[in-house]
Amino acid sequence: MDRSMSNKIRFCHFENFGILPTFDFYNISSINLIIGENGTGKTVFLKALYSATRAMEEYKRGDDIRSMADILSEKLRWTFQVEKLGDMVTRGISESLSFQMSLDEQNVVYQFSPSAERKVGAVTAPDVGRNANSIFIPAKEVLSLFSIILESREVDKSFGFDDTYYDLVKALRIAPKRGRNFDAFAKSRKNLKDVINGKVDFDERSGKWYYKDKNNYRFAIGATSEGIKKISILDRLLANGYLNDQSIIFIDEIESALHPEAICKFLDMIYEIADKMGVQVFISTHSYFVIKKLVLLAMRKKEFITCISLKKDAKKPYINDLHDGMPDNSIIDTSIQLYEQEIEEGL
């Protein structure tokens, strides 16, 4: 079913934002894939959108009286973990970093110079905050590092685990809710449980995570596979009500620790959530399997899955609808080179 883009990111503008090229991104879809070689800015791109989105969600929430400038400044510093904000500006230039994003038919705009210390400069704030919780799932799993991340941020107040990790563990602390969930969420949770043959849960008394298989045998989280832990994170967020149909999910290197079969099933669930609930998703990858699976899913609906290809020294990224087929990219090029090398070695 088609959903309005009113609850989604519809436009973003980057200028002098670290290693990213200066560009405008208009063709934003329900599912957005970011590909590129190492050092092209995939994670920077995801973190920039996530920081702005979370700032909009924290703005005017409850009794919080902080200004948008204060929220953004803190979010950017702890997400990118820079000593001063000016370090985020593209190196070797004197012009300011500028960012703009349109979400919920409202804009957030900010800029700051290379000399900026702790505060962003000019800020355009939305009229109201967002009634949603978005989440960033990093490449590293967090369940076995749960207490370490919390201590690092809440006790030591030190850099090491950025806000993507800290926000995630705080969201995972929320206990699952009883009662009816969104149908698409409930279906996805069942599918997730089938993929990992059990579920991961939190023991309030011991303060530790554990894995329970389909035969109800319990295993310490340290003895549980990385793939199970990664998939279980989404299951927990669907179960505890942290995510809703206005949430935006950012996943960095979705293929990390997952077998290709699990990747395909995981992406099927992501597609179901995006299609039935209208949840928007941004995914980065180095995996051929992820790209190919999303191309196959994109054949179901035009303008539903967009691919952004970042390339070193390119003036702007290449953006295309995956409904039109596999994009040109270094992952495919490398696969072809290996195949050609195999042929040559066999001669």
Language model: regions and residue ranges:
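Phosphate-coordinating catalytic segments in nucleotide- and nucleic-acid-processing enzymes
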Residues: D2-H13, T53-Q246, D313-L347
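Walker B catalytic acidic pair
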Residues: D252-I254
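Phosphate-binding P-loop
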Residues: F23-S29, G241-L243, I273-D275
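C-terminal lobe/lid and adjacent interdomain/linker elements of RecA-like ASCE P-loop ATPase modules
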Residues: D268-L347
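Pre-Walker A-like glycine/lysine-rich segment at the N-terminus of P-loop NTPase domains
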Residues: M1-S51
